[in-house]
């Protein structure tokens, strides 16, 4: 019996790139609407036949740079795409199971089955402080 394996490719998107100083690059448009940028990037990834896009999340500021909340962002992006997978992060440390299930079920319904969950636990002191722990 032969088995065909297929690699799945996803893009991990961040507003100004993955380097901590990427926001300082002269070509970086700090005034632009991040949703417009992400919509263009995700549509490009879809045209390139990538399987999914991924947005990380933190319940605290990362390097002092604000970020859009991924489930809201992915729900909006679902309306601008047709087949690319939409993966977002949610921590089980500070979210109740029912809430996470409801949020991802909503994204899955809105996107017609394209939702994915990056399940994480949190050990970040800044996140803990935001929850009084």
Name each region found by the language model:
Residues 1-81:
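N-terminal beta1-alpha1-beta2 module of alpha/beta enzyme domains
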Residues 53, 86, 115-117:
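Hydrophobic residues within beta-strands of alpha/beta enzymes
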Residues 80-88:
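Conserved catalytic cysteine-centered active-site region
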Residues 58, 89, 120-122:
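Histidine-centered beta-alpha loop that forms part of the nucleotide-sugar donor binding/catalytic region
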Residues 60-63, 90-96:
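Conserved short loop/turn motifs at secondary-structure junctions
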Residues 4-5, 12-31, 93-133:
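Flexible, glycine-rich active-site loops centered on histidine and acidic residues
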């Amino acid at each position: 019996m032969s088995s065909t394996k297929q690699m799945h490719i996803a893009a991990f998107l961040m507003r100004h790139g993955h380097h901590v100083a990427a926001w300082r690059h002269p070509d970086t448009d700090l005034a632009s609407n991040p949703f417009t940028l992400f919509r263009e990037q995700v549509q490009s990834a879809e045209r390139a036949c990538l399987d999914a896009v991924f947005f990380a999340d933190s319940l605290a500021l990362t390097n002092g740079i604000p970020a859009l909340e991924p489930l809201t962002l992915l729900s909006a992006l679902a309306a601008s795409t047709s087949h690319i997978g939409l993966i977002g992060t949610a921590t089980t440390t500070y979210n109740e199971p029912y809430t996470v299930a409801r949020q991802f079920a909503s994204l899955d319904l809105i996107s017609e089955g394209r939702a994915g969950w990056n399940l994480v636990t949190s050990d970040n002191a800044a996140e803990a402080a935001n929850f009084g722990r």
